[in-house]
């Protein structure tokens, strides 16, 4: 929508042709020219009714008909500016105006991304950059993006928004470069790759002490979620991917009865993981015991499997069984 005199003037210049427009621009100040060019590159479609209203206000021009070609193509604008300011200055001015327009488009595009993805993209940036981008977005999108950031960061950004006093157009171009560099250099995969399984995999790679602290903190606010993560962490089936050297250390330190209980109702792949790291005699004996019908409860099986997982985690961390780590294992 055309709302001010600058936009009306820009529309008129696009209507009269590049030659006449260029002559008019020669009589304007550099600041006025820049204002008009910025308005031109941002003008969208105009209805015939609105166009007539604007052109009728230009009483000193002869209006021949209602037809109008809103010509704000780069080719038209550069031709007009070259006539008015010369090739070098005209090209430079148009380039600056187009950069600002493209910057607005780039930042506006973040409104159509999932808020969670935008938050992930911006999370490691300086709070002032995050603040500036959020101010440029739709308020609902900004609020949702903010909800995915940490409590501390949210508070800091709100304080910065309160103290925000505007942004120069040239800074919009810099913001666009920041966004493009994030996408290009970090090669972020903005897809749904989170979830309990991913969280469990990350926790599995941490030391037991830190893993336990995180689980306890999650449990304080969401006990049900903490339980789901714990169940995913303690998947006995994951042992098939573990290095055999750790399995061998485990077998040297675990009671045969506990191993027998833990291997109840497991897949052949899991059993083979242990069999191949045992002597032929031991593996045959364990195989025969597992083939016998047993009445071991599921709880007992899960507890022994959990103990083995903690022992293995301790071995991976320390190269040996740690009694301290065993005392810390989840009950």
Curated annotation (Swiss-Prot):
Membrane topology, from the record: Peripheral membrane protein
Superkingdom per UniProt: Bacteria
Major subcellular location class: membrane
Pfam families, per the entry: FliG_C, FliG_M, FliG_N
Alphabetical list of SUPFAM superfamilies matching this protein: FliG (SSF48029)
Intracellular or extracellular location(s): Cell inner membrane; Bacterial flagellum basal body
GO biological process: bacterial-type flagellum-dependent cell motility; chemotaxis
One term under GO cellular component: bacterial-type flagellum basal body
GO molecular function: cytoskeletal motor activity
Residue positions of motif Part of the EHPQR-motif: 125-128
InterPro entries the record matches: Flg_Motor_Flig, Flg_Motor_Flig_C, FliG_a-hlx, FliG_M, FliG_N
Keywords: Bacterial flagellum, Cell inner membrane, Cell membrane, Chemotaxis, Flagellar rotation, Membrane
Residues flagged as site, Part of the EHPQR-motif: 160
UniProt record similarity statement: Belongs to the FliG family.
PANTHER family per record: FLAGELLAR MOTOR SWITCH PROTEIN FLIG
Role description: FliG is one of three proteins (FliG, FliN, FliM) that forms the rotor-mounted switch complex (C ring), located at the base of the basal body. This complex interacts with the CheY and CheZ chemotaxis proteins, in addition to contacting components of the motor that determine the direction of flagellar rotation.
Name of this chain's protein: Flagellar motor switch protein FliG
The organism of origin for this protein: Buchnera aphidicola subsp. Acyrthosiphon pisum (strain APS)
Gene (UniProt): fliG
